[in-house]
Design a protein with these regions (language model features):
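The serine-hydrolase catalytic nucleophile loop
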Residues: 63-73
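Alpha/beta-hydrolase
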Residues: 188-274, 281
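Catalytic histidine-centered segment of alpha/beta-hydrolase-like enzymes
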Residues: 321-330, 334
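Conserved alpha/beta-hydrolase "acid-adjacent" motif
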Residues: 292-298
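Conserved alpha/beta-hydrolase
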Residues: 78-95
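Conserved hydrolase catalytic core segment
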Residues: 125-171
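Conserved acidic catalytic loop of the alpha/beta-hydrolase fold
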Residues: 109-127
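Short beta-strand/loop motif that positions the catalytic acidic residue
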Residues: 279, 285-287, 291
Length: 345
């Protein structure tokens, strides 16, 4: 009887969600880019009357670009502009028979170039802007700073983006450790946990930015990923039933499948500082001031090393905001990016 009830419940759920029209299946255009064994999904949505396309590049590596659409900040941008969301290889809903030989930063830069060319071919009369978040900031910096790729765009938005892995691992350490004494002194503190962080860094003074996951756990415990989790959850309800049953999303969207630490050791050595000097287009470094994942000093570092004229580059740090302004501070996120696009389109 219990199994029958479950089957009936699932049937009713499927019926309910299938009776409603889903934005994911009715809005925009959905297609794939196949390259070197990877079949990468691309969703173009938003305001097709706009002359502007904002190509987004997700973080991780190993996250999913389609998830940007669930963030209120990106939804507001979709009202004004066309937006491109896509999943990188080894990420999100990407399929295919690609192998570990393609799990390297240069291949991801090549994939990004293919995506840009595909968008240019399908929408030849549009003005392009590029946005990279977290690892996507690092990826877009590496891409823009090579082979004159920045000439394809009117502007670059670096959203809490990485750039120099070794430096950022140390900045995370400097962000985390000064907060531990106060945490240890709090009434009822979990002293074992907080002391463990101190001990871990003593044993691992120079962690890998990509191969060591522990610092990211510590940042999250200190609200450096999401500044206020309660507010975040209230403002960002995720429509899981709709995503699973009435969208192009598959269950693989919820599974991190980027690989093992030993497969990405070379990623810890990424430094795209030289590429920054080759980028001369307008640039906006948009950051959560309280970001502990990619601390806000990185925004200043990127600004200082960019080849862009000072009159066309700026750093904006949003208070009481962690690693995701698009979800934590959507109004400020939208206002800053919209103003940037309107200025340089």
């Amino acid at each position: 009887m219990k199994h029958i009830s479950i089957i009936i419940w699932i049937g009713l759920l499927l019926t309910a969600v299938s009776c409603e029209k889903s934005e994911y299946l009715s809005q925009g255009e959905f297609f794939h880019l196949s390259h070197k064994g990877a079949k990468m999904p691309v969703w173009v949505t938003g305001n097709f009357q706009s002359d502007v396309i904002l190509i987004t590049v997700h973080g991780g590596p190993g996250d999913a670009g389609m998830g940007f659409h669930t963030a209120p900040g990106f939804q507001k941008l979709e009202e004004d502009y066309m937006l491109v969301y896509w999943d990188q290889r080894f990420s999100g809903m990407t399929q295919g028979h690609y192998d570990l030989s393609t799990m390297n930063p240069d291949q991801f830069i090549e994939d990004t170039d293919r995506i840009v060319k595909l968008i240019q071919d399908r929408y030849p009369d549009k003005t392009l802007f590029l946005l990279g978040h977290s690892w996507g900031g690092q990826l877009t910096a590496g891409y823009l700073g090579r082979d004159d790729h920045d000439s394809n765009f009117r502007g670059w938005i670096d959203l809490d983006g990485s750039i120099y892995a070794e430096m950022e691992a140390q900045l995370m350490k400097e962000w985390i450790l000064p907060q531990i004494p106060e945490k240890l002194a709090e009434p009822g503190a979990d002293t074992e946990f907080w002391q463990f962080i101190v001990d871990w860094y003593e044993e691992n003074p120079a962690p890998g930015n990509y191969t060591d996951a522990e610092p990211y756990w510590y940042v999250s415990a200190l609200s450096g990923d999401v500044y206020d989790l309660d507010v975040y959850n209230e403002n960002n309800p995720i429509p899981y039933a709709e995503l699973i049953f009435r969208s192009m999303f598959s269950l693989s969207y919820y599974v991190y499948s980027f690989g093992k630490a030993e497969d990405i050791i070379e990623w810890d050595a990424i430094d795209y500082t030289p590429e920054l000097g080759n980028i001369t287009i307008p640039a906006l470094m948009l950051w959560g001031a309280n970001d502990g994942v990619v601390p806000a000093q990185v925004a200043d570092y990127v600004y200082d090393h960019l080849g862009t004229d000072p009159s066309m580059k700026s750093v904006v740090k949003i208070d009481q905001c962690g690693h995701g302004p698009q979800s934590e501070k959507p109004e400020e996120f939208y206002a800053e990016i919209s103003d940037f696009i309107e200025t340089y389109k």
